[in-house]
Amino acid sequence: MTSLLLFGASEGGLFDFDATLPLMAAQVVLLTFILNALFFKPVGRVVEDREDYVLTSRAEAKKKLAEVEKLENDLKNQLKEARKAAQQVISEAEEDSEKLYKEALNLANSEANASREQARREIDSQRDSALKKLKSDSDKLGDLIVERLLAAK
């Protein structure tokens, strides 16, 4: 120990309890308050603002997604109804065209039958007229033959 005093070394060493330890503790506390005021609070505020923004954005996105799904369902229903109405219009048009086709076919058949009947009546009339004329001519010819035979005797 005497040698330590000769060289001017102080006693204690690592665990000296002098004014530096409380001074260091005060510096740590002061630095903690300064860092808290200058760094941690603003960063915490930014993180909280960002979290609020993300939560708000997610809520708005969910709301918009629900709106889009509702609109999609509405449009699907409208499309389904429009297809159904179009199919009904098509089937009604097909029925109408089939009805018109049948009416036109019946009209054409009745006109053809009427025309055929008219032609048959005209043919019958002409045949009857030809038969009457032929009978008249044959009667005249028969009378002429009888006259010639009687005149020849």
Curated annotation (Swiss-Prot):
Q: Where are the transmembrane segments?
A: 20-40
- InterPro entries in the record: ATP_synth_b, ATP_synth_B-like_membr_sf, ATP_synth_b/b'su_bac/chlpt, ATP_synthase_B_chain
Q: Name one GO molecular function term.
A: proton-transporting ATP synthase activity, rotational mechanism
Give the primary localization class: membrane
Q: Which GO terms describe its cellular component?
A: plasma membrane-derived thylakoid membrane; proton-transporting ATP synthase complex
Specify the protein's topology with respect to the membrane.
Single-pass membrane protein
Source organism, top-level taxon = Bacteria
| Entry keyword Zinc | no
- Identify the keywords attached in UniProt to this record, alphabetized: ATP synthesis, CF(0), Hydrogen ion transport, Ion transport, Membrane, Thylakoid, Transmembrane, Transmembrane helix, Transport
What family classification does the UniProt entry report for this protein? Belongs to the ATPase B chain family.
Q: What does this protein do?
A: F(1)F(0) ATP synthase produces ATP from ADP in the presence of a proton or sodium gradient. F-type ATPases consist of two structural domains, F(1) containing the extramembraneous catalytic core and F(0) containing the membrane proton channel, linked together by a central stalk and a peripheral stalk. During catalysis, ATP synthesis in the catalytic domain of F(1) is coupled via a rotary mechanism of the central stalk subunits to proton translocation. Component of the F(0) channel, it forms part of the peripheral stalk, linking F(1) to F(0). The b'-subunit is a diverged and duplicated form of b found in plants and photosynthetic bacteria.
PANTHER family recorded:
ATP SYNTHASE SUBUNIT B', CHLOROPLASTIC
Q: What is this protein called?
A: ATP synthase subunit b'
Species the sequence originates in: Prochlorococcus marinus (strain SARG / CCMP1375 / SS120)
